[in-house]
Amino acid sequence: MSFIADRVVMDGLTFDDVLLIPAYSEVLPRNVDLTTKFSRNITLNIPMVSAAMDTVTEAKLAIAIAREGGIGVIHKNMTIAEQAKQVQTVKRAENGMIYDPVTITKGKRVADALAMMAEYKIGGIPVVDEGGYLVGIVTNRDLRFEKDMNRSIDEVMTKENLVVTGQSTDMEAAAQILQEHKIEKLPVVDSHNKLIGLITYKDITKAKDKPKACKDSKGRLRVAAGVGVTFNTFERVAALVDAGVDALVIDTAHGHSKGVVDVLKQIKAQYPHIDCVVGNIATGEAAKYLVEAGADAVKVGIGPGSICTTRVIAGVGVPQLSAIYDVAKALEGTGVPLIADGGLRYSGDIVKAIAAGGSSVMMGSLLAGVEESPGDTIIFNGRKFKSYRGMGSLEAMQKGSKDRYFQDVEDDVKKLVPEGIAARVPFKGSLYEVIYQMVGGFRAGMGYCGAHNIEELHKARFTRITNAGVQESHPHDVAITQEAPNYSRGE
């Protein structure tokens, strides 16, 4: 028996190997429905997720992508307290009603109030007594010209004729109250004047500006966070849950392993209300294994990322489009979504990834260059770039991602075996601009396929193409004089 017949079980295809075949269409791109599932219980308004990488997703980017309708996954290359604070920052960025507002106790000093305003980046704080009952509110306006930092806030706060409302007040009524009284913050109290929340003009305005934002039932932006399989995993999980995280992502290089499932089962047993995404995998067998263990979504991609070297260092992986399709077939009927992670270069790749069976895509390099990403800004040859590195790069592993590659027991940096590189990507401007182009391309693809929604896109057909077909697909036989905002062949 030949080697191919005996050991080669499949032909692996990726994005450049295929094109979607256009179909009869009655749908315009602007009218397609982009809603999808991130995990079993979390709905997205666009099928886009930012990667749990330390040069991609921290609070600033997570806030920005949630406002556009996607979700960000805060990376774990930081202390437990820092990651929990990042989650809290996202959860406090927007609210229908703030259920746990920052408060200050009466008797505190002006200096204390100013410090809290600076720490939480807020312009006003409700003042409460020891029992949590509202006694006043102190704002920037009250403190603007105050020179005595030791003066009690009781003397400067607004305490007469306080405008408050009850918990049953809806946002439209709250907006009218704020406008009528020309105030920006509306304390919410119970029948005994105990503070139970806060409604702000800023949050109402943000909700109107971004109606498709990904939010929880309390009107707060959704956010996920990455965790590993290491000695302090459950301490980290507990802190993230306390911080209000919407989903946990067990982020490893090889999700089809006993250690990962052991962690998954423990998390689901302890926190059954928190969705748990597990990855990364590349086969249908792995998907079934994780679903049986309780996964609320699976993340697909072994080595397709631009900064990943797993396939050449370990010799392991499955070309991404085939991996997505294989896992999608295994997930049929389970209700468990598939997140396609890695290998995306253009918006057309996103269309292909979803058409092959994905529910959403996870983006690293496509978002690493935006101004909201935490990567360092670099000027090189007169052009602006941002740093971008794989979580399997030596630099990232030294900072804390060793456990992702099952090397957390290794302290000697010389004995680490990296599966990624450090790089740079061109600066791209704001996340909004990038997402706008990605979503626009995705809508166009759905229109060409005649798909009203993502479920219909899953029925689209592909054609396999040659290298000549790939060359023909790109601009050719011309010199590009001005780049489009959604197309580039590299630096």
Report the location of each language-model feature.
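Glycine-rich phosphate-binding active-site loops on the catalytic face of alpha/beta enzymes
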Residues: 67-82, 245-257, 296-314, 344-378
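Active-site-adjacent beta->alpha loops and helix N-cap segments on the catalytic face
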Residues: 30, 79-88, 146-150, 194-214, ...
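Alpha/beta catalytic cores of nucleotide-metabolism and tRNA/nucleoside-modifying enzymes
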Residues: 1-24, 104-105, 166, 176, ...
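Catalytic beta/alpha-barrel core
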Residues: 73-77, 103-104, 124-126, 164-166, ...
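Short beta->alpha transition motifs characteristic of CBS
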Residues: 74-79, 122, 126, 133-149, ...
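Catalytic cores of alpha/beta
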Residues: 60-63, 235-243, 282-300, 340, ...
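Short beta-strand/loop segments at the ligand-binding rim of alpha/beta enzyme cores
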Residues: 43-50, 96-101, 160, 216-226, ...
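Bateman/CBS regulatory modules and CBS-like beta-alpha motifs in cytosolic regions of diverse proteins
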Residues: 28-44, 51-53, 82-120, 127-129, ...
